[in-house]
Protein backbone atom coordinates (compact mmCIF):
# COMPACT_ATOMS: atom_id res chain seq x y z
CA UNK A 1 0.00 0.00 0.00
CA UNK A 2 1.37 3.38 -0.94
CA UNK A 3 0.55 6.73 0.52
CA UNK A 4 -0.74 9.79 -1.28
CA UNK A 5 -3.72 10.72 -3.39
CA UNK A 6 -4.46 7.25 -4.85
CA UNK A 7 -4.77 5.83 -1.35
CA UNK A 8 -7.27 8.48 -0.28
CA UNK A 9 -9.81 7.06 -2.73
CA UNK A 10 -9.94 3.86 -0.71
CA UNK A 11 -11.41 5.71 2.27
CA UNK A 12 -14.94 5.92 0.81
CA UNK A 13 -16.05 2.45 1.85
CA UNK A 14 -18.91 1.90 4.28
CA UNK A 15 -21.85 4.16 5.03
CA UNK A 16 -22.57 6.65 7.77
CA UNK A 17 -26.35 6.24 7.64
CA UNK A 18 -28.48 3.13 8.13
CA UNK A 19 -32.27 2.66 8.10
CA UNK A 20 -33.97 4.42 11.01
CA UNK A 21 -36.26 2.18 13.02
CA UNK A 22 -38.71 5.01 13.75
CA UNK A 23 -39.20 6.69 10.36
CA UNK A 24 -37.84 3.97 8.06
CA UNK A 25 -35.62 6.34 6.09
CA UNK A 26 -31.91 5.74 5.53
CA UNK A 27 -30.93 8.66 7.74
CA UNK A 28 -29.82 7.18 11.06
CA UNK A 29 -26.18 8.18 11.67
CA UNK A 30 -24.27 5.19 13.01
CA UNK A 31 -21.64 7.06 15.04
CA UNK A 32 -23.86 9.90 16.27
CA UNK A 33 -26.80 7.53 16.99
CA UNK A 34 -29.23 10.19 15.72
CA UNK A 35 -31.63 10.15 12.78
CA UNK A 36 -31.17 13.14 10.46
CA UNK A 37 -34.75 12.87 9.18
CA UNK A 38 -36.93 12.41 12.26
CA UNK A 39 -34.56 13.19 15.17
CA UNK A 40 -34.76 9.70 16.71
CA UNK A 41 -32.08 9.31 19.35
CA UNK A 42 -32.06 13.01 20.14
CA UNK A 43 -35.68 13.69 21.06
CA UNK A 44 -38.93 11.85 21.65
CA UNK A 45 -40.79 14.23 19.33
CA UNK A 46 -40.70 13.83 15.55
CA UNK A 47 -38.49 16.47 13.95
CA UNK A 48 -40.65 18.89 11.92
CA UNK A 49 -40.51 22.50 10.81
CA UNK A 50 -43.03 25.00 9.45
CA UNK A 51 -41.02 25.46 6.23
CA UNK A 52 -41.64 21.81 5.30
CA UNK A 53 -45.16 22.70 4.18
CA UNK A 54 -46.32 25.24 1.65
CA UNK A 55 -48.17 28.19 3.18
CA UNK A 56 -51.90 28.21 2.48
CA UNK A 57 -53.93 31.35 1.99
CA UNK A 58 -57.65 30.98 2.54
CA UNK A 59 -59.34 27.66 3.24
CA UNK A 60 -57.68 24.32 2.79
CA UNK A 61 -55.17 21.93 4.26
CA UNK A 62 -51.44 22.48 4.24
CA UNK A 63 -49.75 20.82 1.31
CA UNK A 64 -46.49 18.95 1.77
UniProtKB/Swiss-Prot annotation:
A zinc finger (C4-type) spans 20-38. Binds 1 zinc ion per subunit. Keywords: Metal-binding, Ribonucleoprotein, Ribosomal protein, RNA-binding, rRNA-binding, Zinc, Zinc-finger. GO terms for biological process: translation. Zn(2+) binds at residues 20, 23, 35, 38. The keyword Metal-binding applies. GO terms for molecular function: rRNA binding; structural constituent of ribosome; zinc ion binding. The keyword Zinc applies. Binds to the 23S rRNA. This is Large ribosomal subunit protein eL37. It comes from Methanococcus maripaludis (strain DSM 14266 / JCM 13030 / NBRC 101832 / S2 / LL).
